[in-house]
């Protein structure tokens, strides 16, 4: 239950004051939990609310359901599939336009730099390169900070939290969508070490959410058939479908997009949703294929077939894409290394984001200064490091002194018929660098020193770049970093490994993805779809399982850590061990506000003005019942509708039998507003005479809310709360001689900050168990390494 947030200093506990600033949470929560919570949404702190997935079964719902014709049901089903088709078309077009813009903007910049380098104008080339990068990133940061802070970052933590039941202002607004697209184009084109995949997930979710708004009065879109989707359940399904479509648009991986939404994003899944999501991602794949063929003839500038990080290894050097049983230990080693590097990557990312938050909270100017500093550092690193790399002769000389057998390789300062392997990775967009690393039959193309330098730079820049206030993704930089260390491992092993270096680069990407994102099935399918080679499937599966298992012993996935850092109240699918020691009665806090079945208007107005609760128990008392009995649960939004309609009674009595609810109210009167929008009581003005009247709440009360007994374990209640998708869970007493309602459980009652704030004695047991778990896992892997060494 929620109201306005208190000042930040009121939420800081004594223990937190004694902790170093870089280990405190970004946003502090109240232990009493009777207030609205706030979280970082994009790059701005915003109040957050929970979503209502429960069907409100009251008299109005029953009448509307009985009068619904067969044509309405058919129209509803057809509309759902039509929306899926439209989401697929628009997401595919937007994905193509983003890649087209990035390829041309970045390509023009790199072409200008290469031209200056060829004419030995080295300093001019650097200033052009650094100046263009700075201008592009400042533009992306400025529009993000000024127009829509919710568009900052990848957006995946916010989408994942939304699909878990957390709502926040403007995460799917039209402004956020526009800033996400334009800002991501500028950020990726600025040579910042970020990607397009995460923002594409958020973009697809924005497109779907716009369809799920159920129309707009501002723009005159008020057709009746649009109102079918003015509820959180259908919006949740559409956002899930849109997020999967975004993955499909980023990687041309339709099956991987469906599995990504299922494994990583969605908290609730139904078989019917799989069909619709698969249909949408298939539409995206077809749209992208059409545009790629259209641009294959050079009509799209520098785009060609690029921009969608697809590298087909199935038809080139098939004899090199083989492996044997003796290569399995190498695959295991790659998985373990990827897990350790991924867990450390997550740890460093959290520390950097904490430091950046201290800078960003000082205002817009500091956000832009931080972006400028990161841009200058990136430009100096990207342009300066290739000077220390040796020039290598081209395997096959091409026209104008270029390497004819190598794609997208840079000559930089080298003489004709030579190339700079480090510049070929640094001075390319990430997609082309990935293609270069995945290329088979190129074992002698890179120098080990160049690989080590690029790995360290990619690792560090990936950590430093994400916290900049601009739309930025993690997926592609992680793929690139993993591919680099995969090739480096293959070089270090030398003749001890018969695996092609391009194949090991793919396995390195998989292991680093498993170590950071902690996804297995979806990442496996995405990699197979990217490389178009099923021969890789067993090795990719093995390396993902190993990397995820090992990395889980250190910390959580990067998206989960970011959600916790932002303060988004995400409910995990499993309960913490200490929750089994508590009952729901141990965490319910008061005071509880309730209404009579026939309540005075003035009392309702007073409660709505003095509290921020979003639901209230309705209790029938004499003369409407022989003893106090729970009738149901009424929502705050529904009470506001009743007050605006002014359907009041002069005395404390129920509506007469001839009273027709359908004649005075329509189901659309109680439709849920769009994401992040809340009705307020401030706009309700009543006369003193109306304040003395009464309103019958029975026809508008959910008469069958979910209830639990106060003795139920908190862990069991959490499973029920999450699986059903509840916003409110009523707690009833064990004995009959008490009040019919003990309290109401909401999402924030299950948060560790709230539970451990009420019962701090459990805190030591929680961390003690965690330390034992890590020690046991570490001992297990030490013994495993010893056994492998003895076998060898």
What kind of region is each of these model predictions?
Residues 779-792:
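Extreme C-terminal disordered tails of eukaryotic proteins encode short linear targeting/docking signals used
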Residues 719-782:
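C-terminal interaction modules of eukaryotic adaptor/scaffold proteins
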């Amino acid at each position: 239950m929620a109201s306005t947030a208190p000042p930040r200093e009121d939420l800081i506990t004594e223990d937190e004051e004694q902790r170093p600033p870089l280990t405190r949470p970004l946003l502090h929560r109240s232990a009493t939990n009777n207030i609205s919570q706030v979280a970082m949404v994009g790059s701005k702190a915003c109040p957050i609310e929970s979503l209502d997935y429960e069907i409100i079964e009251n008299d109005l719902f029953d009448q509307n359901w009985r009068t619904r014709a067969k044509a309405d049901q058919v129209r509803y089903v057809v509309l759902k599939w039509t929306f899926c088709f439209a989401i697929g078309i628009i997401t595919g077009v937007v994905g193509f336009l983003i890649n087209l813009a990035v390829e041309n903007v970045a390509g023009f910049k790199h072409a200008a730099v290469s031209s200056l380098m060829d004419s030995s104008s080295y300093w001019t080339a650097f200033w052009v390169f650094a100046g263009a990068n700075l201008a592009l990133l400042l533009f992306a940061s400025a529009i993000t900070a000024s127009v829509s802070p919710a568009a900052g970052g990848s957006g995946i933590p916010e989408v994942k939290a939304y699909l878990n039941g957390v709502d926040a202002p403007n995460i799917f607004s039209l402004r956020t969508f526009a800033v996400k697209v334009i800002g991501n184009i500028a950020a990726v084109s600025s040579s910042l070490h970020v990607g397009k995949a995460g923002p594409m997930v958020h973009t697809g979710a924005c497109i779907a959410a716009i369809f799920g708004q159920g129309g707009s009065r501002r723009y005159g879109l008020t057709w009746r058939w649009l109102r079918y989707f003015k509820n959180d359940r259908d919006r949740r399904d559409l956002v899930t479908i849109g997020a999967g479509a975004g993955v499909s648009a980023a990687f041309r991986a339709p099956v991987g997009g469906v599995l990504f939404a299922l494994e990583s994003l969605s908290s609730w899944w139904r078989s019917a949703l799989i069909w619709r999501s698969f249909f949408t991602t298939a539409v995206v794949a077809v749209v992208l294929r059409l545009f790629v063929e259209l641009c294959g003839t050079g009509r799209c500038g520098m785009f060609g077939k690029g921009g969608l990080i697809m590298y087909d290894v199935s038809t080139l050097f098939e004899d090199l894409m083989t492996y044997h049983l003796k290569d399995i230990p190498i695959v295991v080693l790659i998985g373990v290394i990827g897990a350790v590097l991924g867990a450390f990557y997550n740890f460093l990312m959290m520390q950097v984001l904490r430091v950046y938050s201290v800078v960003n909270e000082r205002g817009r100017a500091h956000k832009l200064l931080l972006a400028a500093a990161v841009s200058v550092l990136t430009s100096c690193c990207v342009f300066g490091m290739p000077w220390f790399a040796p020039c290598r002769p081209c395997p096959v000389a091409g026209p104008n002194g270029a390497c004819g057998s190598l794609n997208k390789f840079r000559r930089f300062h080298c003489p004709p018929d030579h190339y700079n392997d480090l510049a070929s990775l640094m001075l390319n967009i990430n997609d082309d660098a990935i293609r270069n690393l995945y290329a088979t039959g190129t074992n002698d193309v890179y120098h080990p020193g160049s690989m080590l330098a690029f790995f360290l730079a990619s690792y560090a820049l990936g950590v430093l770049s994400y916290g900049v206030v601009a739309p930025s993704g993690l997926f592609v930089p992680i793929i690139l970093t993993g591919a680099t260390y995969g090739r480096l491992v293959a070089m270090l092993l030398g003749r001890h490994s018969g695996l092609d270096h391009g194949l090991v680069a793919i396995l390195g990407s998989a292991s680093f993805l498993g170590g950071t994102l902690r996804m297995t099935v979806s990442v496996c399918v995405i990699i197979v779809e990217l490389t178009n080679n099923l021969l890789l499937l067993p090795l990719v599966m093995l390396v993902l399982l190993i990397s995820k298992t090992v990395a889980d012993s250190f910390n959580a996935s990067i998206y989960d850590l970011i959600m916790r850092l932002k303060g988004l109240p995400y409910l995990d699918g499993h309960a913490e061990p200490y929750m089994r020691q508590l009952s729901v009665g141990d965490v319910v806090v008061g005071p509880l506000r309730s209404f009579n079945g026939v309540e005075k208007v003035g009392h309702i107005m007073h409660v709505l003005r003095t509290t921020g609760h979003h639901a209230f128990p309705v209790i029938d008392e004499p003369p409407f019942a022989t003893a106090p009995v729970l009738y149901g649960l009424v929502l705050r939004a529904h009470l506001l509708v009743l007050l605006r309609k002014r359907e009041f009674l002069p005395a404390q009595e129920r509506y007469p039998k001839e009273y027709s609810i359908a004649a005075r109210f329509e189901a659309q009167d109680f439709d849920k507003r769009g994401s992040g929008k809340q009705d307020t009581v401030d706009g309700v003005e009543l006369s003193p005479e109306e304040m003395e009247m009464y309103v019958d709440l029975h026809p508008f009360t959910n008469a069958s809310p979910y209830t639990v007994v106060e003795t139920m374990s908190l862990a069991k209640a959490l499973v029920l709360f999450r699986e059903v998708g509840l916003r409110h869970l009523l707690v009833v007493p064990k004995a009959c001689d008490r009040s019919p309602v003990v309290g109401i459980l909401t999402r924030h009652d299950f948060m560790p900050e709230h539970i451990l704030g009420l019962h701090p004695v459990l805190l030591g047991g929680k961390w003690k168990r965690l330390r034992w778990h890590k020690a046991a896992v570490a001992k297990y892997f030490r013994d495993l390494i010893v056994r492998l060494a003895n076998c060898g």
